[in-house]
C-alpha cells in the first residue's frame, strides 16, 4: 500500500512540473506583464511570471 501511494505521489509531482514548463517566447519578451497574453495566444489557460521566466498553465 505504501508503494502505491509513493508511486502516485511521484507521478503527481512530475505532472505538476511538466504543467508549468517555461515558455521561451515569453522569456524572450522579458516577461513584463505580457506573460498571460502570450500564454493565452498559445492556447494555454494563463501564465505567471517567476524570476523573469514565464510559466504557462495547461
From Swiss-Prot:
Keywords: Disulfide bond, Ion channel impairing toxin, Neurotoxin, Potassium channel impairing toxin, Secreted, Signal, Toxin. Expressed by the venom gland. One of its GO terms (cellular component) is extracellular region. It is found in: Secreted. It comes from the Eukaryota. InterPro entries: Scorpion_toxin-like_sf. One of its GO terms (molecular function) is potassium channel regulator activity. The record marks 48 as: Basic residue of the functional dyad. Disulfide bonds join 31-49, 35-54, 39-56. Coiled coil: none annotated. Residues 1-19 form the signal peptide. The record marks 57 as: Aromatic residue of the functional dyad. Inhibits voltage-gated potassium channels. Belongs to the short scorpion toxin superfamily. Potassium channel inhibitor family. Alpha-KTx 26 subfamily. Has the structural arrangement of an alpha-helix connected to antiparallel beta-sheets by disulfide bonds (CS-alpha/beta). This is Potassium channel toxin alpha-KTx 26.2. It comes from Lychas mucronatus (Chinese swimming scorpion).
Amino acid at each position: 500500500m505504501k508503494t502505491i501511494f509513493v508511486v502516485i505521489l511521484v507521478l503527481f509531482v512530475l505532472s505538476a512540473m511538466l504543467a508549468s514548463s517555461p515558455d521561451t517566447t515569453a522569456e524572450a519578451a522579458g516577461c513584463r506583464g505580457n506573460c498571460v497574453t502570450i500564454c493565452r495566444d498559445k492556447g494555454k489557460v494563463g501564465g505567471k511570471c517567476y524570476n523573469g521566466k514565464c510559466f504557462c498553465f495547461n
